[in-house]
Regions:
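A polyanion-binding, active-site-adjacent surface
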Residues: 1-244
Length: 244
């Protein structure tokens, strides 16, 4: 099992990879990669849709009006931003805040899955349709399943998945805000259940049986230890890689 320091260093490496990503055309119009922010050891993680204009300028998720509402809702359950980790399905802003395209979600999925594996939250709150459909692997919309916690295996980990309306959808619709607030109030009781059982790790392949000696065969002469196989070079350290 990785230590907290090891997980943070790996998370920084994924961040550096994302900063240089050119896997889809969104890199041509972004100002900043919006990787995610918060507590890298959080039990609770929020996953939204994509950065907006404010997020693209600042490089941080949920810093506009939807972010202020998210902070207010967290405060109502005795939490703050520093207690959780917040990310999006996309790390770059789609032009005009349009909906993400499927190929963009596919190109960015690696970064989100790496975050989920390294942060290892107990509970993930998906915010809105795109995050919910992506992590559930199901086309059912948020209006039908919001506020219904379930246990899901995502990548190598099993988590408590809790679909919620996106705060942006609740800004100007009182009925949606009421539903979002009611669902939010259940977060502490779901977190209190603790982490779900994790899947068994895959069994190691069996060791191959030693080869039987062939009668009458000439004995094999071992190759010189240094001539044929050179020593591998030393890996670069974090400073050389530009990690912080």
């Amino acid at each position: 099992m990785r230590t907290a320091i090891e997980r943070r260093e790996l998370l920084k490496a994924v961040y550096e990879e994302a900063r240089g990503c050119v896997a889809c055309p969104l890199h041509e119009t972004r100002t900043n990669v919006v990787f995610g922010a918060g507590n890298a050891d959080a039990d609770l993680m929020f996953v939204g849709e994509a950065p907006g204009a404010n997020e693209d300028q600042q490089g941080l998720p949920f810093v506009g009006q939807a972010g202020k509402l998210l902070e207010k809702l967290l405060g109502e359950i005795g939490m703050e931003r520093g207690d959780v980790f917040i990310a999006n399905t996309l790390k770059c802003r789609p032009p005009g805040n349009r909906d993400p395209y499927p190929h963009e979600l596919d190109a960015c999925r690696h970064y989100l899955e790496s975050q989920l594996e390294l942060i290892a939250p107990t509970m993930i709150c998906t915010l809105g349709n795109f995050a919910t459909k992506l992590l559930r692997g199901d086309p059912i919309g948020i209006s039908k399943i919001h506020g219904q916690p379930e246990v899901r295996t995502i990548g190598p980990r099993t988590v408590r998945l809790y679909p919620l309306y996106h705060p942006a959808a609740a800004l100007y619709t009182p009925s949606t805000l009421e539903m979002l607030r009611g669902d939010f109030l259940r977060i502490p009781e779901i977190l209190a259940l603790g982490p779900p059982d994790q899947p068994e790790p895959p069994a190691a392949p069996p060791e191959p049986a030693p080869a039987e000696p062939v009668l009458g065969a000439e004995p094999t002469v071992a190759a010189p230890p240094y001539d044929a196989i050179p020593e591998p070079p030393e890996p670069p350290d974090a400073e050389q890689l530009g990690l912080f």
